[in-house]
């Protein structure tokens, strides 16, 4: 995820570059997305000139509809990115009329004291831009995500001539992609992927299901091309695949490909004449690919001797679920084709030779590596030294770097930084109660006891015990034993005041968790409902209830 801020200290004017998300893993159950805490820039929103977006990947625009309402500033983006963020705001019923400014490719916007030039690069999505940010202190090149693709197939080529000119004009600092800094050679071209995918399509004789990143429109066009060349129809499966296709056509791309057919109609086409292009290349539980493999998709069926083509890489952290998906397919007699056995995917980020080209074009005085893990940043620092950059600067989240001509760049301050976790539609911190409780429940289960007692400490009826997620095989035995422990604990208390009642609740909580630990090895999240009842006559009761979570 990305959120960068550039500011001029003397007049306190700021711009933001990108507002992205990352996707949560199993360590934060119930949370889907995480985005950078924008608190630092919210405090400066009166001096914020705008948000500038480099391209439309989720780690660069995914948080825009969550963060923008707190800022209410102008947004600057090229046409394809603009179409996708308009949809994001529509989904949340947020009106940005008058705020979104569509920027033409290779053009410049003036946000005094900044002048920002959009420079076309190549990446794994349409309209990726590097930003040449002119400031009174000097020029900065913010690369965004990029690579050097000599044949991107769709969209413009990397504007290397303009990059060379920018380098000759002088660049104070380059903020540069580090993702593939460990990879030798070049990242590869979409044209090479097309050639190899066509060979795969020509070899296969049954139903073909291709899964790829929906945002890679060049890859999408390649699958359309291969389908047409081999006499097959194509059907798009998955919401994001349809969304990207629609956005691309709206912006003038994909005009020459065959029209896709509805997946409901595709069921009537013979196996050897249909290709499905679907979402779920990372094994996402609700992705189309996962549903197809589990035979729960309403329209797409897969059977023995069909082929599934994974035209994508495995994102770190997804290995286990993807290998499980691959194995399930193989068990069903389905051929699995991936970058492990065919050259059918290339990265969208620069390998070392691509980086070398950029360094030679830009000739920056300083380099700030970004976009990658800590180990990538360190390796990129070493690469910058190898390229004779005078000032490689290592940064961490929240670092404020001072850039000024003639001076060594330095981290001179720290901005408050952190992560915001979207829990449902509520932004929370990682240590929020809801996340802590959910983690506890996922590991240890949940137990609840409801008890009615008189002021003298007599239990009215038996305690009502319920639990979820505990490895209990003899329910009656477990519940009976816990009831006895609850009764034993209650007998040690007299309930003359509220404090004693609260103390009893705490004691019951300990009793329940201790008993569960002894019997199951688990200390569940425990809820005690304690009702103090006053019985004045057989048919009339008044109760006060207390509930505590722990």
Task: Show the residue positions of the predicted features.
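C-terminal tails and terminal domains of large nucleic-acid-associated
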Residues: 501-532
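Conserved beta-strand scaffold positions in the cores of enzyme catalytic domains, especially
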Residues: 100-102, 173-175, 308, 336, ...
């Amino acid at each position: 995820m990305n959120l960068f801020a550039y500011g001029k200290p003397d007049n306190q004017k700021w711009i933001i570059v990108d507002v992205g998300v990352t996707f949560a893993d199993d360590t934060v159950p119930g949370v889907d997305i995480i985005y950078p805490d924008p608190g630092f820039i919210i405090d400066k929103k009166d001096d914020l000139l705008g948000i500038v977006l480099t391209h439309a990947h989720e780690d660069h625009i995914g948080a825009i509809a969550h963060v923008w309402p707190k800022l209410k500033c102008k947004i600057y983006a090229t046409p394809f990115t603009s179409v996708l963020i308009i949809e994001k705001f529509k989904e949340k019923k947020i009106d940005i009329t008058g705020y979104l400014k569509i920027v033409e490719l290779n053009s410049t916007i003036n946000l005094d004291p900044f002048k920002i030039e959009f420079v076309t690069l190549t990446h794994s999505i349409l309209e990726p831009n590097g930003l040449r940010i002119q400031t009174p202190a000097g020029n900065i090149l913010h690369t965004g995500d990029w690579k050097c693709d000599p044949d991107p197939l769709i969209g413009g080529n990397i504007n290397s001539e303009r990059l060379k000119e920018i380098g000759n004009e002088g660049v104070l600092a380059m903020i540069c992609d580090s993702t593939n800094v460990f990879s030798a050679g070049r990242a590869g071209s979409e044209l090479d992927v097309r050639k190899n995918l066509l060979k795969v399509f020509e070899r296969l004789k049954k139903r073909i299901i291709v899964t790829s990143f929906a945002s890679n429109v060049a890859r999408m066009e390649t699958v359309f091309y291969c389908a047409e060349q081999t006499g097959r129809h194509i059907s798009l499966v998955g919401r994001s695949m349809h969304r990207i296709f629609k956005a691309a056509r709206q912006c003038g791309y994909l005009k020459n490909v065959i029209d896709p057919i509805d997946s409901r109609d595709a069921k009537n086409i013979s196996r050897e004449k249909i290709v499905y292009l679907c979402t779920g290349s990372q094994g996402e539980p609700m992705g189309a690919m996962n549903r197809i493999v589990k035979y729960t998709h309403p329209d797409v069926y897969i059977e023995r001797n069909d082929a599934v083509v994974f035209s994508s890489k495995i994102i770190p952290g997804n290995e286990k679920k993807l290998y499980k998906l691959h194995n399930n397919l193989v068990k069903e007699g389905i051929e699995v084709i991936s970058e492990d056995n065919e050259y059918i995917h290339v990265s969208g980020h620069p390998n070392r030779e691509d980086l070398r080209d950029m360094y030679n074009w830009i000739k920056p005085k300083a380099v700030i590596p970004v976009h990658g893990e800590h180990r990538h940043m360190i390796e990129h620092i070493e690469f910058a030294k190898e390229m004779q950059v005078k000032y490689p600067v290592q940064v961490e989240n929240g670092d404020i770097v001072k850039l000024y001509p003639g001076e060594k760049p330095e981290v001179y301050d720290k901005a408050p930084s952190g992560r915001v976790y979207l829990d449902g539609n509520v932004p929370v911190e990682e240590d929020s109660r809801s996340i802590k409780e959910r983690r506890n429940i996922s590991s240890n289960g949940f137990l609840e006891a409801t008890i009615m007692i008189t002021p003298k400490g007599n239990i009215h009826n038996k305690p009502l015990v319920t639990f979820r997620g505990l490895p209990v095989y003899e329910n009656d035995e477990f519940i009976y034993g816990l009831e006895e422990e609850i009764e034993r604990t209650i007998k040690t208390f007299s309930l003359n005041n509220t404090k004693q009642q609260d103390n009893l609740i705490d004691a019951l909580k300990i009793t329940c968790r201790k008993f569960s630990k002894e019997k199951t090895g688990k200390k569940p999240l425990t809820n005690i409902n304690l009702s103090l009842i006053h019985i004045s006559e057989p048919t009339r009761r008044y109760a006060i209830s207390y509930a505590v979570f722990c």
